């Protein structure tokens, strides 16, 4: 796997810093942990922003950090990211907050240190847009939303 240097600042001065950890040597995403003063109960249908206590500095504009749900929390408890995927731009310096929604039927309790999401670093390309009279033809054309079938 490729690696990049990511500078981290811990924004909570009242707690000992804890660097993010990869769960296994082959993990693509690094776990983000909740940084809480007390337990947080997320009711069904409720959206909350969970602080991580971390701020990062990406090495250059060609890299972005993307926050994804943890598969176990989503499949077992219905805890998903409220915005689908969190995008951390290379020039953002604030605390990483994870916006989650409880799509389950039961309240979900988050404790300090719980692994609540995962962050993946990916290359980012800046689009250089230009206006065209028409787009090139393809076999698919304008077909979308299930136009290619399910089997």
From Swiss-Prot:
<comment type="pathway">
    <text>Pyrimidine metabolism; dUMP biosynthesis; dUMP from dCTP (dUTP route): step 2/2.</text>
</comment>
<feature type="binding site">
    <location>
        <begin position="70"/>
        <end position="72"/>
    </location>
    <ligand>
        <name>substrate</name>
    </ligand>
</feature>
<dbReference type="InterPro" id="IPR008181">
    <property type="entry name" value="dUTPase"/>
</dbReference>
<keyword id="KW-0378">Hydrolase</keyword>
<keyword id="KW-0546">Nucleotide metabolism</keyword>
<dbReference type="InterPro" id="IPR036157">
    <property type="entry name" value="dUTPase-like_sf"/>
</dbReference>
<comment type="function">
    <text>This enzyme is involved in nucleotide metabolism: it produces dUMP, the immediate precursor of thymidine nucleotides and it decreases the intracellular concentration of dUTP so that uracil cannot be incorporated into DNA.</text>
</comment>
<dbReference type="GO" id="GO:0006226">
    <property type="term" value="P:dUMP biosynthetic process"/>
</dbReference>
<feature type="binding site">
    <location>
        <position position="83"/>
    </location>
    <ligand>
        <name>substrate</name>
    </ligand>
</feature>
<dbReference type="GO" id="GO:0004170">
    <property type="term" value="F:dUTP diphosphatase activity"/>
</dbReference>
<comment type="similarity">
    <text>Belongs to the dUTPase family.</text>
</comment>
<protein>
    <recommendedName>
        <fullName>Deoxyuridine 5'-triphosphate nucleotidohydrolase</fullName>
        <ecNumber>3.6.1.23</ecNumber>
    </recommendedName>
</protein>
<dbReference type="InterPro" id="IPR029054">
    <property type="entry name" value="dUTPase-like"/>
</dbReference>
<feature type="binding site">
    <location>
        <begin position="87"/>
        <end position="89"/>
    </location>
    <ligand>
        <name>substrate</name>
    </ligand>
</feature>
<dbReference type="Pfam" id="PF00692">
    <property type="entry name" value="dUTPase"/>
</dbReference>
<keyword id="KW-0479">Metal-binding</keyword>
<dbReference type="GO" id="GO:0000287">
    <property type="term" value="F:magnesium ion binding"/>
</dbReference>
<dbReference type="GO" id="GO:0046081">
    <property type="term" value="P:dUTP catabolic process"/>
</dbReference>
<dbReference type="InterPro" id="IPR033704">
    <property type="entry name" value="dUTPase_trimeric"/>
</dbReference>
<keyword id="KW-0460">Magnesium</keyword>
């Amino acid at each position: 796997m490729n690696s990049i240097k990511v500078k981290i600042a811990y924004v909570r001065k009242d707690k000992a810093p804890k660097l993010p950890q990869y769960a296994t040597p082959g993990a693509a995403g690094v776990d983000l942990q909740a940084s809480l003063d007390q337990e947080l109960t997320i009711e069904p249908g409720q959206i909350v922003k969970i602080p991580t206590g971390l701020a990062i500095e990406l090495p250059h504009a060609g890299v972005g950090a993307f926050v994804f749900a943890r598969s176990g929390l989503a499949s077992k408890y219905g805890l998903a990211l409220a915005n689908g995927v969190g995008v951390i731009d290379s020039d953002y310096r604030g605390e990483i907050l994870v916006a989650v929604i409880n799509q389950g039927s039961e309240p979900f309790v988050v404790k300090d240190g719980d692994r609540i999401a995962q962050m993946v670093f990916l290359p980012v390309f800046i689009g250089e847009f230009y206006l065209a009279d028409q787009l090139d033809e393809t076999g698919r054309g304008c077909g979308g939303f299930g136009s290619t079938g399910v089997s």
